[in-house]
Amino acid sequence: MPLDQEFEQGTANGDEMTFIEHLEELRWNIIRAVSAILVFTILAFIFIEEIYDKIILAPSRPDFWTYRMLCKLADFTGAEGLCINKLDFELQSREMAGQFTMALLSAVIIGLLFAFPYAFWEIWRFIKPGLKPSERKISRGAVLYVTFLFMSGVLFGYYVVSPLAINFLANFQLDPRIKNQFDITSYVGLISVLTLACGLTFQLPVVAFVLSKIGFLNPRFMREYRRHAFVVILILAAVITPSPDVLSQVLVAMPLTLLYEISILVSAWVEKTKKAEAELEAKQEENDALSNPWNPESDM
């Protein structure tokens, strides 16, 4: 029987695990999570050549899906600046073990991405038994929500943010005599950072839920500073878009704005739930006080 199930049964029976037992359970959770990462890393390394050709190097070619969609959008709207049909740069490896090192690093990153749902589930199954019944009810489906948001952010970073950033950096030119010859480590590092950063950024509703639950955040604060948040989002979109066209900035700003609005709704829902729980608890205490024969108020 898994250790977390034993803990839940023990909690239900009024028994508590010792500190050593908690550490033992956490150790096995970590071992299982690391094992999953290792398995996916090995699989990624086995197929690393196909992964580089079809996935990692795909945004460096003008026939990438995002570039083709932008060209279609440019034809439809008449905004020629949106169309990306030329990426004037070369990739090279300047170290003897450069390509092998990048193969290992890329395999590890891919292993982390694919093992994330299971690794988070292992962490969650350790935390969940220690929550109150009301907290478990509110956080039901946490693994599903976190995984969905993270993977959505990864896809957004790969298909939207990374291609726009690559195009901007590849076509930025100080002088025609300067040729762009990027090292493979720089290219892979850029895609990895942007993709993982977007995956974490898409956790904004989850962060809003946690902060609202512990009382550090409320929907009134988020609504009050909504305009400030929109300005930050627009600045961020302007930095990574390939041209000053408004449409290209909107492509990046829209999902981030939507996430902020969803976070406001999440915070409001948490606040409403906390008020309902407080009222229910107060009513329960009042009923207990009235039913207590030793309570002077019950004799009146």
Question: Which residues does each PLM region occupy?
Answer:
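Membrane topogenic/interface segments and analogous intrinsically disordered interaction regions
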Residues: M1-M300
